[in-house]
Amino acid sequence: MELLLLSNSTLPGKAWLEHALPLIAEQLQGRRSAVFIPFAGVTQTWDDYTEKTAAVLAPLGVSVTGIHSVVDPVAAIENAEIVIVGGGNTFQLLKQCRERGLLAPITDVVKRGALYIGWSAGANLACPTIRTTNDMPIVDPQGFDALNLFPLQINPHFTNALPEGHKGETREQRIRELLVVAPELTIIGLPEGNWITVSKGHATLGGPNTTYVFKAGEEAVPLEAGHRF
């Protein structure tokens, strides 16, 4: 399988998806026809989200079709060379994909060789479940099971920093809560600016920041770019 799982879409001082474009270009390998899954977008319309994505990827020669705009979305996915899943609210994303019967077709086409690109919520959707999202559960997705294209859980936008005076839990504390009730999980705290690529049977960490792996009963393990999972 070919996957590009990004923690986030925007970095300080850079345009939207700018940091991801070289990574996308490297993994295209001749693929040009993409379907875009905009359902995580809540405060922007799906048309606007699709148009923004299409404009950014046009210089790479990628043609983007919003899956919400086609008559037969399952057929569109089955014929896609690239599946792009945008960030936003992960619960809304999973709910829409489940209700429209898109989870199995996405999994199948990626396993057959389509490239999967997802940022933030889109990276969460590639995991076995969405239980490591940071998002508010604004809708009920009727279960947390997701695509299971990547075997570990990703927590995008990972940071352990707290604002001065803030008394809420750190991100690691939230992750540790999940590991109490699901100790079988391995969770990757993927900070902004980092990504995971899956290509030719290998999953590789990229990006300038330290990533952390969390397991039940163990200290967090720091990982740097180039680490293979």
UniProtKB/Swiss-Prot annotation:
GO terms for cellular component: cytoplasm. Gene3D superfamilies: 3.40.50.880. The keyword Protease applies. It is an enzyme of class 3 (hydrolase). Keywords: Cytoplasm, Dipeptidase, Hydrolase, Protease, Serine protease. GO terms for biological process: proteolysis. Coiled coil: none annotated. Its EC number is 3.4.13.21. It is found in: Cytoplasm. Pfam families: Peptidase_S51. The keyword Lyase does not apply. Belongs to the peptidase S51 family. Hydrolyzes dipeptides containing N-terminal aspartate residues. May play a role in allowing the cell to use peptide aspartate to spare carbon otherwise required for the synthesis of the aspartate family of amino acids. This is Peptidase E. It comes from Shigella flexneri.
